[in-house]
Amino acid sequence: MTDDMHKTENFPPDWLLVESLDLEAQGVAHRADGKVVFIKGALPFELVSANVHRKKNNWEQGVVTAIHRESSQRVQPGCPHFGLHEGACGGCKMQHLHVGAQVAVKQRVLEDNLWHLGKVKADTILRPIEGPAWGYRYRARLSVRYVRKKGELLIGFHERKSGYVADMKECPVLPPHVSDLLLPLRALISAMEAMETCPQIELACGDSVTALVLRHMEPLTHGDLALLRGFAAQHAGVQWWLQPNGPETAHLLDEGGQALSYDLPEFGIHMPFKPTDFTQVNPHINRVLVSRALRLLDAKRHERVIDWFCGLGNFTLPIATQAREVLGVEGSEALVARSRQNFKLNQALAPVNKSLAATNFVARNLFEMTPELLIQDGAADKWLVDPPREGAVSLVQALAELHQQKLDPIGHPPIVGAVGWMPPKRIVYVSCNPSTLARDADLLVHQAGYRCSFAGVVNMFPHTAHVESMAVFDLEV
């Protein structure tokens, strides 16, 4: 904000006019001398006072102490554990902002990142994908800690900017049946001999089963195992998993029972998974996300599609209902094996007149891709790319190198197999980090011969500052 804009507002010099929110959901303001001030708890267009607790040459950071002019988008938080008070939960950052305004903030973050970091502007902004604002979080990692000074055990997320566990009795972003388990879980773990050696419970909800993965540092006694079994018997749909070491050691307490799974009914896909597998936190949004991604991909029955970072096949299997041939590429051999199992299961379940396309899966280190490896996986008409937060820079860099070699074969070393290899005419990129999306978009648009046709946000995590998004890149003819 310029000095002139400050002068148009007649307010005391120590008051701050908030202009926007940053990626941590802090209000961003400027002092009259241009210094940036980040203010926790402040919203855009509010006039506030702040207690500054950190100062640098070019910026300051503080906490709002008074709101002199309130935003029309400020709302009452839906959770008693949210806020700036001591002991407040750090799981959510934006409950004080109307959910529609949260989406607008995330859309601005996406567009700002694309332009300022990648010098890319989408031809068309997609309508945001939105869903339920509460009860959406079907995956969570809850910390468990016995506090000797208080003589009590706590289960919940960490406190805001702290390693301490918040004293949570409920959590409205969890499904109600899971939120209702928080206090019973406290009582359960408090009664166990292993109370002080169980640091974490990871939860994963399927369509009909809730898996609780108990991380335990020491072997559990017969008495503790009996308590876990009794808890599961009292709470319908609860399934205990035990994890003595890393995620790969997680196993069912008792074999049998219903498998953890979710469905993508639009495509007739059934997806079994383990609680330690990566699946989307928000199943409601995931269904809409897959549907939109496939509409944008627009795979035809004569086309070959590659799904990079395919995981368990969340996109791969729906694509197989539309394309001629699909290749799923993933970094983990174990995940590739599981993807193959999921494909075989769905192939067996599919009606004769709706059989899945020929689908293969390969393991590949997607953070060390080369043009030669890209060629080895074969040309495809279209790509779907769904990377982790680190993005897909190695993949798109390899694509850019092939494009540059084609444009200037004399100025670039020859690439074995490049002759006859064709780049995908469309790429649908699903991102969980707008800054790495912008970096990869820069490569695709300015070095690989694509334009950004569409971009938009996906509100996968309401009330948090996490920005999920989707962009479509089309090859320039």
From Swiss-Prot:
Enzyme class, UniProt record, top EC level: transferase
EC number of the protein: 2.1.1.190
Domain TRAM, residue spans: 7-66
Catalysed reaction equations from the record: uridine(1939) in 23S rRNA + S-adenosyl-L-methionine = 5-methyluridine(1939) in 23S rRNA + S-adenosyl-L-homocysteine + H(+)
Protein name: 23S rRNA (uracil(1939)-C(5))-methyltransferase RlmD
PROSITE patterns per the UniProt record, alphabetical: SAM_MT_RNA_M5U, TRMA_2
Protein purpose: Catalyzes the formation of 5-methyl-uridine at position 1939 (m5U1939) in 23S rRNA.
Residues where S-adenosyl-L-methionine binds: Q280, F309, N314, E330, N365, D386
UniProt-annotated catalytic positions: C432 (nucleophile)
PANTHER family reported in the protein's UniProt record: 23S RRNA (URACIL(1939)-C(5))-METHYLTRANSFERASE RLMD, RNA M5U METHYLTRANSFERASE
One annotated GO biological process: rRNA base methylation
Binding site for [4Fe-4S] cluster: C79, C89, C92, C171
Record's keyword annotation contains Nuclease: no
A molecular-function term among this protein's GO annotations: RNA binding
Similarity field: Belongs to the class I-like SAM-binding methyltransferase superfamily. RNA M5U methyltransferase family. RlmD subfamily.
Cited InterPro entries: 23S_rRNA_MeTrfase_RlmD, MeTrfase_TrmA_CS, NA-bd_OB-fold, SAM-dependent_MTases_sf, U5_MeTrfase_fam
Keywords: 4Fe-4S, Iron, Iron-sulfur, Metal-binding, Methyltransferase, rRNA processing, S-adenosyl-L-methionine, Transferase
